[in-house]
């Protein structure tokens, strides 16, 4: 039984009902509907911390989905899972792929910046201030892009950019 049919979460159930109605009204192919069902099940599994199941659903959605914009969100969510698992290099790969398909995805740009900032802090802890500065500059570059797309978001990043003289 698909996850969407066994979900007890009210919000997820509501989303599922609305999505099913939209899929019936809008002109979509069977393949698009199937891709969306896998994506929806992936989001549900991810929300419950079932990352292996979420990844399986996202990979199936990627196999079926042809629209670059829709694929960007699937890739972004795969990146989130890898970030949650501490697999930052893998997460970066997926975030880069997401923004390649959808350059207007500020949350992916933000997450890339967060990873570079984290790596910069690690470099400081290791006593490598030169590497830290390079990593912080990379973080700043991605945060500036994210802020350009979503000016009222990422307030903490905006403050950090001002504090460090990078804005």
Curated annotation (Swiss-Prot):
Name the Gene3D superfamilies for this protein. Tetratricopeptide repeat domain
GO-annotated biological processes: photosynthesis
Q: Which InterPro entries match?
A: PSI_Ycf3_assembly (IPR022818), TPR-like_helical_dom_sf (IPR011990), TPR_rpt (IPR019734)
**Keywords carried by this UniProt record:** Chloroplast, Membrane, Photosynthesis, Plastid, Repeat, Thylakoid, TPR repeat
Recorded hits in PROSITE patterns, A to Z, give:
TPR (PS50005), TPR_REGION (PS50293)
Positions of the TPR repeats?
A: 35-68, 72-105, 120-153
Where it sits in the cell: the answer is: Plastid, Chloroplast thylakoid membrane
One Pfam family from the record: TPR_1
List, alphabetically, the GO terms of the cellular component aspect: chloroplast thylakoid membrane
UniProt KW Translocase keyword: no
Entry keyword Disulfide bond: no
Topology of this chain in the membrane = Peripheral membrane protein
What's the stated role of this polypeptide? Essential for the assembly of the photosystem I (PSI) complex. May act as a chaperone-like factor to guide the assembly of the PSI subunits.
| Listed HAMAP family | Ycf3
Annotated family? Belongs to the Ycf3 family.
- What is the name attached to this protein's record? Photosystem I assembly protein Ycf3
> Per UniProt, what is the name of the gene that codes for the protein in this document?
ycf3
């Amino acid at each position: 039984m698909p996850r969407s049919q066994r979900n007890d979460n009210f919000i997820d159930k509501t989303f599922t009902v609305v999505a099913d109605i939209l899929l019936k009204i809008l002109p979509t192919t069977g393949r698009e509907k199937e891709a969306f069902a896998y994506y929806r099940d992936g989001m549900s599994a991810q929300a419950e911390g079932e990352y292996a199941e979420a990844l399986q659903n996202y990979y199936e959605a990627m196999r079926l989905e042809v629209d670059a914009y829709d694929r960007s969100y699937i890739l972004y969510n795969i990146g989130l899972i890898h970030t949650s698992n501490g697999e930052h290099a893998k997460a970066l790969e997926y975030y880069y792929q997401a923004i390649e398909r959808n350059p207007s995805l500020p949350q992916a740009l933000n997450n890339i910046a967060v990873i570079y900032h984290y790596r910069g802090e690690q470099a400081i802890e290791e006593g490598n201030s030169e590497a830290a500065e390079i990593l912080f500059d990379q973080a700043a570059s991605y945060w500036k892009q994210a802020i350009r797309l979503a000016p009222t978001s990422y307030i903490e990043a905006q403050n950090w950019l001002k504090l460090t003289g990078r804005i």
